[in-house]
Amino acid sequence: MSNISFSTNPNIAPSAICDLREAVGWARQEEDYPAALQGYWATVGGFDVANTLVAWCAIVSDGVRNAVLLDVIVHPLHQGKGVGRTLVAKAIEHIKAHHITIIHVDFLPERTAFYQRCGFRVGLGGIYEA
């Protein structure tokens, strides 16, 4: 894995997350992130040696039983090097430290093998978009 350091609940400018989203081909959603960052239960960031955000995910939780991983993102230059698996592992570690036992994640079918390698069991679920 490349020289990436991980931090839970790092102080990140919304624009850094938007830059990372854009790097993977997602919409920047700049107008959403100031409020979204306030609503997350936790976040995990991965930073390169220049302290640039290269990996990130958000966690929402009831704080008791359930947590959901959102927006697991790794910059394309760092994909395929174990950064994503470490990012997810750090998120799971933080969740388990709070005695939360059920962790959910939604993903596209082409990401199934990745999440299985991270320890997730694939089951049926549903997404409702308003």
Regions found by a protein language model. Give the residues of each.
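Conserved acetyl-CoA-binding loop of GNAT-fold acetyltransferases
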Residues: 118-126
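Conserved beta-strand-loop-alpha-helix junction that forms the acyl-donor binding cleft
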Residues: 104-113, 129-130
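Residue-level recognition of the GNAT/N-acetyltransferase active site
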Residues: 9, 75, 108
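A conserved beta-strand-loop-helix scaffold within acyl/acetyltransferase catalytic domains
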Residues: 32-40, 47-50, 54-73
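Conserved GNAT acetyl-CoA-binding A-motif
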Residues: 95-107
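Conserved acetyl-CoA pyrophosphate-binding loop and the N-cap/start of the following alpha-helix
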Residues: 78, 82-90
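Short amphipathic alpha-helix that is part of the acyltransferase structural core
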Residues: 1-32, 47, 126
